[in-house]
């Protein structure tokens, strides 16, 4: 790596420092399942049959199709969480060093997942009201947390009042909001041909006015309520042009707002439409590596291609996801704890905004929907729980290392390891990350390709810095020889010169 033009580098890092979206830790909450409501029994009237209330110790399972409701039974099983119970648990987000609270959909809808909107401008009563949301946002902001909502703007639920009127009255002005006709199997077009999810005709001006263009639109009005951004469901279905229009509307309404899209593709090119995407490309790469399907050398090349193609600024705002409400839990896909620790650590150390799905931090297990939406295991949030204890240390360390949230990335050539640097405008903030997925220790000599790293510089394990046996390596003439234990990962930071000691960095930034 050539010495960067220092002023340009400083300016780029300073811009990232000022942008809360770059490298933020995002904690995702499925509201019904995150924390039990204090008034659980008083809420029974909100769940009329065929909806069912479940107890917190129960786990969701695939159900049967309920003909009268037009949905599956597991879609209308409820555990009773709400916005007030989320407020009561904001301290947990602080403990994991989260920067952002992201809520799965909360607008009025029939199901527990709320991806079938019945009214965008109203909160589902099981969860609360717009006033409850404003109180949650206020409490979150007081703790330094941003709040992002899930926007489902490609389709609605069949119980949406506009859709019901459109189907009932051929002359309804809302008829043009949907794709209605005999050429469709159900008499209308549904997302993925699901009858419960009629597609919106977003080409219509009046539809976009209702969703994001108009002053009282969903996107704008919730931003005025204090939220800080939107995660867009099935964003690719909206198309780049309308995504750009929506993103611009959000930025116009609130400077610095975030619009991140659910895109199951490579991230390259989406920066022209969105602030970031859910980086499922990164997820596949990390799962392949931590499951032993590809080696460190191949993984390094895949990650470098991803960053080079999309650009580091965009990647820093993309959400680094290992699991969410649409995927099996990480503990199911990577059952080995040592391998899972590597996945967690790389999610935290690679460029991007780590997206932690509630319960990931305690190793919650579960297959695909609905198993991946189990109630939060609060009994596992304790100091002697190995995974929780490690995740707290990991994210406390991440917050203390500016390079991991705001820095550039430089992948190092290695035959068997995954190795990379995270760098900022301050050389002594450089971080070296080493991962070994093999069952044996690996020793290699790596070229440390940053010319600012002076001969004699030591790097030491940041998570175990004060332990006498903490891993430490030395750089000489741009090389370092490392031995990484089997199935392990290390985040190493520069050992700074002691006060009064000669420093080769005395005239280096």
Regions flagged by a language model, labelled:
Residues 1-146, 161, 487, 496, ...:
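N-terminal structural segment of carbohydrate-active enzymes
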Residues 68-84, 116-130, 195-210, 227-237, ...:
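The substrate-binding groove and active-site-proximal loops of carbohydrate-active enzymes
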Residues 25-27, 101-103, 147-149, 230, ...:
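Hydrophobic faces of well-ordered beta-strands that scaffold small-molecule active sites
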Residues 30-33, 101-111, 151-159, 233-239, ...:
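Short, solvent-exposed turn/loop segments enriched in Gly/Ser/Thr/Pro and often Arg
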Residues 161-225, 235-236:
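Active-site-adjacent "subsite" loops/lids of carbohydrate-active enzymes
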């Amino acid at each position: 790596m050539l010495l960067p033009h220092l002023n340009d580098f400083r300016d780029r890092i300073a811009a990232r420092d000022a942008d809360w979206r770059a490298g933020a830790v995002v904690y995702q909450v499925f509201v019904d399942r995150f924390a039990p409501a204090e008034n659980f029994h008083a809420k029974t009237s909100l769940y009329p049959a065929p909806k069912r209330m479940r107890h917190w110790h129960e786990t969701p399972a695939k159900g049967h199709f309920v003909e009268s409701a037009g949905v599956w039974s597991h879609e209308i099983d409820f555990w009773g969480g709400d916005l007030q119970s989320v407020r009561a648990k904001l301290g947990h987000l602080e403990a994991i060093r989260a920067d952002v609270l992201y809520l799965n959909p909360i607008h009025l809808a029939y199901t527990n997942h709320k991806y079938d909107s019945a009214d965008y401008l109203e909160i589902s009563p099981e969860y609360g009201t717009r006033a409850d949301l404003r109180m949650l946002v206020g409490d979150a902001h007081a703790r330094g947390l941003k709040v992002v909502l899930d926007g489902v703007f490609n389709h609605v639920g069949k119980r949406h009042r506009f859709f019901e009127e459109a189907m009932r009255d051929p002359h309804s002005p809302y008829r043009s909001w949907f794709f209605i006709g005999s050429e469709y199997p159900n008499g209308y077009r549904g997302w993925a041909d699901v009858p419960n999810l009629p597609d919106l005709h977003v080409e219509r001006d009046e539809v976009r006015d209702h969703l994001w263009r108009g002053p009282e639109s969903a996107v704008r009005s919730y931003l005025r309520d204090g939220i800080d951004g939107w995660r867009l469901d099935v964003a690719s279905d909206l198309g780049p042009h309308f995504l750009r229009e929506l993103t611009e509307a959000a930025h116009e309404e609130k400077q610095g707002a975030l619009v991140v899209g659910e895109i199951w593709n490579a991230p390259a090119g989406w920066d022209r439409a969105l602030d970031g995407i859910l980086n499922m490309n990164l997820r596949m790469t990390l799962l392949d590596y931590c499951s032993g399907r590809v080696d460190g050398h191949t993984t390094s090349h895949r990650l470098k291609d991803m960053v080079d193609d999309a650009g580091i600024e965009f990647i820093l705002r993309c959400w680094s996801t290992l699991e969410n409400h649409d995927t099996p839990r990480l503990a199911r896909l990577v059952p080995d704890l040592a391998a899972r620790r590597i996945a967690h650590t790389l999610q935290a150390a690679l460029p991007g905004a780590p997206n932690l799905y509630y319960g990931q931090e305690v190793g919650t297990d579960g297959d695909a929907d609905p198993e991946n939406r189990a109630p939060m295991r609060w009994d596992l949030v304790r100091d002697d729980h190995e995974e929780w204890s490690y995740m707290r240390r990991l994210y406390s360390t991440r917050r203390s290392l500016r390079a991991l949230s705001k820095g550039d990335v430089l992948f190092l050539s290695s035959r068997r390891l995954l190795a990379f640097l995270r760098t900022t405008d301050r050389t002594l903030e450089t971080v070296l990350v080493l991962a070994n997925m093999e069952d044996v220790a690996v020793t290699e000599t790596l070229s440390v390709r940053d010319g600012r790293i002076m001969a004699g510089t030591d790097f030491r394990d940041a998570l175990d810095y004060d332990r006498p046996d903490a891993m430490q390596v030395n750089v000489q003439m741009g090389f370092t020889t490392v031995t990484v234990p089997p199935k392990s990962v290390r985040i190493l930071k520069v050992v700074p010169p002691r006060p009064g000691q000669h420093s080769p960095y005395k005239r280096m930034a």
